A protein has these predicted regions:
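Periodic aromatic/glycine/histidine/acidic cluster detector
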Residues: 4, 15-244, 248-261
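Repetitive helical segments and hydrophobic/amphipathic motifs
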Residues: 11-12
């Protein structure tokens, strides 16, 4: 009897200690195949396939001794290629491409030792360039440019070690300046100016360390003052004034710690 009890106690320990070998499949509750992959001595080996609930192929991945290796692919539900990426010893290496369903590129970026390195480009569905920016050690570095669908310049931003830095400019598709901003170490700083498409000044806003600060002014396109507002540490404070386009005072509001009085 004691031997039988010892044997019964030993069996679960053996089963828990087993390592996966061969094909291993997991399924959706409906019974449809979800993942199929091969194991050798408990680690993934070879091709892994993932499937949508409908049975369509979702992605393929390759493993060597448990590490991601070679090309991985992802597919849209309808079957079109979504993206490709290459791995070397578990790290992203080389070009990653993402695609629209039509087959046109959404974006392309290069990896070195799992870090984005070099130029990244993103595209409109039409194939026109949408965004271009460079990476150094996985951080944005230097000038980023954005473009309208027409190809006209949309904006310019500057990055230093992944943080927005200095003056940025945004443009209307017609080419006119839309607004000018300023950043210091990723935070909004100083005077921001916004313009109507006609070129007339629309507003002047002030920031200190990312917070709305001081007097903000808004203008009618005709040039007349529209309103004056005030902030202290990102909170509405003091008297706010609103004007008719004729220049006459329309009404005022007063705020104390963000609460209208």
């Amino acid at each position: 009897m004691k031997k039988l009890l010892l044997l019964l106690l030993f069996v679960p320990l053996v089963s828990f200690g087993q390592v996966k070998n061969g094909e291993h499949n997991t399924y959706y509750e409906s019974g449809e195949l979800k993942v199929t992959v091969n194991y050798v001595d408990g680690v993934k080996q070879g091709l892994e396939k993932l499937f949508y609930y409908s049975g369509e192929l979702k992605s393929t991945a390759n493993y060597v001794d448990g590490l991601a290796q070679g090309e991985w692919k992802s597919f849209y539900y309808s079957g079109e290629l979504r993206y490709t990426i290459n791995y070397v010893d578990g790290l992203r290496e080389g070009e990653e491409n993402t695609y629209w369903k039509s087959g046109e590129l959404v974006s392309t970026v290069n990896y070195v030792d799992n870090f984005r390195e070099g130029e990244k480009n993103a595209y409109w569905k039409s194939g026109e360039l949408k965004i271009t920016v460079s990476f150094v050690d996985d951080l944005k570095q230097g000038e980023e440019k954005g473009f309208h669908k027409s190809g006209a310049l949309n904006y310019t931003l500057n990055y230093v070690d992944g943080l927005t830095q200095g003056e940025s400019k945004y443009y209307y598709e017609s080419g006119g300046l839309k607004f000018i901003t300023n950043y210091v170490d990723g935070l909004r700083q100083g005077e921001w100016k916004y313009y109507y498409e006609s070129g007339e000044l629309e507003s002047i806003k002030n920031y200190v360390d990312g917070l709305r600060q001081g007097e903000w002014k808004y203008y009618y396109e005709s040039g007349g003052l529209k309103s004056i507002t005030n902030y202290v540490d990102d909170v509405r404070q003091g008297e706010w004034k609103y004007y008719y386009e004729s220049g006459e005072l329309d009404y005022t509001r007063n705020y104390v710690d963000g609460v209208k009085q």
